[in-house]
Amino acid sequence: MYSMMMETDLHSPGGAPAPGGGLSGQSGAGGGGGGGGGGGGKAGQDRVKRPMNAFMVWSRGQRRKMAQENPKMHNSEISKRLGAEWKVMSEAEKRPFIDEAKRLRALHMKEHPDYKYRPRRKTKTLLKKDKYSLAGGLLGAGPAAGGPPAVGVGMGVGVIPGGVGQRLESPGGAAGGGYAHMNGWANGAYPGSVAAAAAAAAMMQEAQLAYGQHPGGGGHPHHPHPHHPHHPHNPQPMHRYDMGALQYSPISNSQGYVSASPSGYGALPYGSQPHQNSAAAAAAAAAAAAASSGALGALGSLVKSEPSVSPPVTSHSRAPCPGDLREMISMYLPGGEGGDPAAAAAQSRLHSLPQHYQSASTGVNGTVPLTHI
């Protein structure tokens, strides 16, 4: 109880000693005079308390007296009243307590000549720092920002549920080496702006999803509105194209259907030859480098460059027919049951792509206005 009263006196408003006492910068605590010992325990013996100043010497008796008179009064309210009362006291009334404080300080210096006051850290500030570091650790489990940039920006669109989050780049221009980033932030990067990080990552994820609704490589921008008559909205074939292209590799038979990644939008026309795969890889690497310096800027440049792509083809999917439904069902069957039929279906589907795109290009040209974006 006494130690709690001492701590409250330390933080009370009137805790500053009298000007004549010279005790404002004094160190230390407890062992001698009226200061009392450390409680006899090992922790109490290790930590030496500071000597009392004049206000503490006076308020020790006054606090006990006021607590007896007002047993329901809170300790903080008692401290406020004691501080206000100490301020209005005259110098003559304070003199005996100032002298007692000087004696206690001299005794403390004699008993602890090498004592140096070390203030204890406040737990509130530590909790705030731990909260920010914990939030940074939850956002990312990869290496810190400044590591090697992520090369795999062009992973298959929609192949796995976490694909979009894994492809996002760090705003600082250098994502971590692994694909363990959630929302594109590295571990411990920008710990003080967690809300801004979440907002930026959500914007980038929406942009990636908007471009991922249809298979990549087209010269026609994406229409988010389902009421356009020339392309019914059907995002399901995106999974079928990507799964077939990654699992069964029909790239060489599809007349240049080589781009299934968001970094390859507008990079190559559908009429290119299979030997241009290296050019596609170079274009994807260049787009990845551009995305690392600013993912949103790269998306904006791609939107601007899409209408001028030649030949004017569209990348929109057709309405599903019963055959497509069977293909979609067979795509998600285990490898032992539907592996070969799915491979054959994917091959035939990709063989028919050039004719479909050429027929669709007669109705829709590549210069559609971008007012819908």
From Swiss-Prot:
GO cellular component: nucleus
DNA-binding region: 48-116
Main location group: nucleus
Start-end of Basic residues biased regions: 220-233
InterPro entries attached to this UniProt entry: HMG_box_dom (IPR009071), HMG_box_dom_sf (IPR036910), SOX_fam (IPR022097), SRY-related_HMG-box_TF-like (IPR050140)
One Pfam family, short name: HMG_box
A single GO BP: neuron differentiation
Positions of region (Disordered): 1-48, 211-241
Stated role: Transcriptional activator. May function as a switch in neuronal development. Keeps neural cells undifferentiated by counteracting the activity of proneural protein and suppresses neuronal differentiation.
Protein name: Transcription factor SOX-1
Recorded name of the encoding gene: SOX1
